[in-house]
Amino acid sequence: MSWLFGLNKGQQGPPSVPGFPEPPSPPGGSGDGGDKNKPKDKWSNFDPTGLERAAKAARELDQSRHAKEALNLAKVQEETLQLEQQSKIKEYEAAVEQLKNEQIRVQAEERRKTLNEETKQHQARAQYQDKLARQRYEDQLRQQQLQNEENLRRQEESVQKQEAMRKATVEHEMELRHKNEMLRIEAEARARAKVERENADIIRENIRLKAAEHRQTVLESIKTAGTVFGEGFRAFISDWDKVTATVAGLSLLAVGIYTAKNATGVAGRYIEARLGKPSLVRDTSRFTVAEAVKHPVKISKRLLSKIQDALEGVILSPKLEERVRDIAIATRNTKANKGLYRNILMYGPPGTGKTLFAKKLAMHSGMDYAIMTGGDVAPMGREGVTAMHKVFDWAGTSKRGLLLFVDEADAFLRKRSTEKISEDLRATLNAFLYRTGEQSNKFMLVLASNQPEQFDWAINDRIDEIVHFDLPGLEERERLVRLYFDKYVLQPASEGKQRLKVAQFDYGKKCSDLAQLTEGMSGREISKLGVAWQAAAYASEDGILNEAMIDARVADAIRQHQQKMEWLKAEGKENAAKESGKNPLQPLLEGTPV
């Protein structure tokens, strides 16, 4: 509306309104349009009332006192419209720019797709060309291989032909040479035969002369040798001094050989009895010359060691401890007074301290000890008798007295009436009975067995005292647990030299609890528990033995002990079943005293 109030004079006229028609052309215009393009027809329906109302409203607005405000309002509206138009133009321009950018992006995308497609086409073309090249190369290799094979075949055929020709040539040459050789040999044989026929009388004469000369030479040699030997023997016989000296020399030579042979045997047996160790002896406190040279410090300590307590390190029940202490005191006094030693039988379950007490008894009494096992006797066969005599001969040479400890004695000291014993073992048993028939002041016999009822009756007759080693009770088990816990755990941990530490818990209470849990276990099984605790600590990551690890090892040991007991019960049932099928008179026929 600004043009209506005379504003924006420098601008163009009002814009054309689409709803209003164009003004009529002047009458002098061209009449090409005909009658239907006349102004009369075009403006015949025009209504000017609208323009009149607009003009009237403009006059009223000019005359109004609010004309200035209306003018300002119109200006503001015009500016607002212009700003809206400019914003629309900017939006249009932004849309155009966006469209251009979109077109550029689309073109770039199309170009990228085109490049990708071209790249794919190039790659496909390159792959196809490479495939063709590979095929051509493979075909060339195949052709070359076929050609090489053909050349090789031809070469082989040529070589075979040459070899055949060479072989034929050599065969022909050998055949010709053979023919020539046969002809030469035939000619030589004919010539030799002709010469021999012509010289037959001369050859026979030469042979006759050579034989006569050889016979004459042999006869002269025999005559000369007989004359020499005859004169020498005659001269020897005629000189009685030479005859006497010769006989004496031969006699002395025979006596020297016999004496040296027997003296060597006697000296060897003496050295073996004094210095050697019998093959049946597994362990002994007596030392040989070789051991003294090899371990001088150990032997010196043993010689300078003081007499130990017989029950040091041995944990037994009070009643049994009192009895074995009496045995130790009696044995020591017997040695001091040079009396006769008493033979002892110790029986009981395995691992109850029989072997340990035997060693302690020997040390307490100031005696030497020797340990042999019954299982070593049976495999020796016929050598068992000799080996048994060597053991007792060796025992009799001890100046300090010898405690001979036979572990698992029931392995060879069985009843002689049973059919299971062999003749060699029976002879060895008889030798043992012969050497132990009387009391001795040289050695003390200590037998250990888990099944003393299998002993021959003569063995029982040679036993002076029987000691039963039973499984440890609650108090003894607690002492054993404390002993081995201190030996295998606390002492290595306190020394600090080994990778072993102990966690903080009540050791005394734990040992008491373990003693209650280990009911029925032997001392050896409890000692193995101590070793198991030490091994568990070494196997841990930090080397610390805690209470849980101890309980785990104890539970495992209890489970193993129960399994062993089940096996023992099953074995007892089998033996009972076998015993029930025996002859009821068999016990009356077994063994008689010797």
From Swiss-Prot:
GO terms for cellular component: mitochondrial inner membrane; mitochondrial nucleoid. The keyword Thylakoid does not apply. The chain crosses the membrane at residues 243-260. GO terms for molecular function: ATP binding; ATP hydrolysis activity. Residues 1-242 are mitochondrial intermembrane. ATP binds at residues 348-355. The keyword Transferase does not apply. Residues 33-44, 571-581 have a biased composition (Basic and acidic residues). It comes from the Eukaryota. It holds the Pfam family ATAD3_N. Belongs to the AAA ATPase family. Essential for mitochondrial network organization, mitochondrial metabolism and cell growth at organism and cellular level. May play an important role in mitochondrial protein synthesis. May also participate in mitochondrial DNA replication. May bind to mitochondrial DNA D-loops and contribute to nucleoid stability. Required for enhanced channeling of cholesterol for hormone-dependent steroidogenesis. This is ATPase family AAA domain-containing protein 3. The lineage of its organism: Eukaryota, Metazoa, Chordata, Craniata, Vertebrata.
